[in-house]
């Protein structure tokens, strides 16, 4: 997978030189490139922003540097993703969708964002990290790149490493425990020490359902629930409201 980031601050992305994303680069599973679109400004001072037509607060990123930077990229069938608080909210399903692509381009905005013509003519995806506003798109891009890259084949070693992650099943993930079994009087649930895999799977599913009901009940509206799941949720729904 080729990933290109258009940004005014490429130095911010050194965080991706660590951990899983770094390993994916070392193993040639992804290629990460950063383009400072200020380099494409035709303004002799390297200016990339101007005041908006019609007035209003803030400055807007001009279309010319973005259009020229995109035109300079190698020809490819690509997703061009604008990071914007007005976009679709990023989620695990979108990360999974992107992980099947071969070429992603992230546009990191600043100030009041991009001239609308960038969105109309270049962008395939307008995506937001959440219902809040960041200073720029860089942190959002790093988050989305990490979430996408870890889903690529063999990046985590085996598929099971992410198949039970929160949101991958439509639910929040169940609690995890490791040694020691008793830490300062805080004990691991007995079922996890039982060796009974069927009981363990049931416990994990129920814990995921309970956690989702308590913390993100909105996810249950679209989760793939069995009749057993529904009965369990019904049995605890009164408790979760107490």
From Swiss-Prot:
Question: Might you give the EC number(s) for this enzyme?
Answer: 2.1.1.228
Transmembrane stretches in the record are: none
Highest taxon listed in the record's lineage: Bacteria
List the Gene3D superfamilies hit by this protein, alphabetically: 3.40.1280.10, tRNA(m1g37)methyltransferase, domain 2
The main location class comes to cytoplasm
Q: What GO biological process terms are annotated to this protein in UniProt?
A: tRNA N1-guanine methylation
GO cellular component terms, alphabetically, are:
cytosol
The protein's GO terms of the molecular function aspect are: tRNA (guanine(37)-N1)-methyltransferase activity
Q: Which UniProt keywords apply?
A: Cytoplasm, Methyltransferase, S-adenosyl-L-methionine, Transferase, tRNA processing
CDD domains xrefs? TrmD-like (cd18080)
Where does this protein hold S-adenosyl-L-methionine? 109, 129-134
Indicate the enzyme's highest-level EC class: transferase
List the Pfam families: tRNA_m1G_MT (PF01746)
Q: How does it assemble?
A: Homodimer.
Question: What does this protein do, in the record's words?
Answer: Specifically methylates guanosine-37 in various tRNAs.
The name this protein carries in UniProt is: tRNA (guanine-N(1)-)-methyltransferase
UniProt source species: Exiguobacterium sibiricum (strain DSM 17290 / CCUG 55495 / CIP 109462 / JCM 13490 / 255-15)
């Amino acid at each position: 997978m080729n990933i290109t980031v258009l940004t005014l601050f490429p130095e911010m992305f050194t965080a991706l030189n660590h951990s899983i994303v770094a390993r994916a680069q070392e193993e040639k599973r992804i290629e990460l490139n950063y383009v400072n679109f200020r380099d494409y400004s035709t303004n002799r001072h390297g200016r990339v922003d101007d005041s908006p037509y019609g007035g209003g607060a803030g400055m807007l990123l001009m279309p010319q540097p973005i259009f020229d930077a995109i035109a300079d990229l190698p020809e490819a069938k690509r997703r061009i993703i604008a990071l914007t608080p007005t976009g679709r909210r990023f989620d695990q399903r979108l990360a999974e969708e992107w992980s099947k692509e071969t070429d992603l381009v992230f546009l990191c905005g600043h100030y009041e964002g991009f001239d609308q013509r960038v969105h109309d003519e270049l962008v395939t995806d307008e995506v937001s990290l959440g219902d809040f506003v960041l200073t720029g798109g860089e942190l959002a891009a790093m988050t989305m790149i990490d979430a996408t890259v870890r889903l690529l084949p063999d990046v985590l070693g085996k598929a099971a490493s992410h198949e039970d992650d929160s949101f991958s099943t439509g639910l929040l993930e169940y609690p995890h425990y490791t040694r020691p079994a008793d830490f300062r009087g805080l004990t691991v649930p007995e079922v996890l020490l039982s060796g009974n895999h069927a009981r363990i799977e049931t416990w994990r599913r129920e814990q995921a359902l309970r956690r989702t009901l308590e913390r993100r009940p909105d996810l249950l509206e679209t989760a793939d629930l069995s009749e057993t799941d529904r009965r369990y949720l019904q049995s605890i729904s009164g408790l979760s409201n107490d």
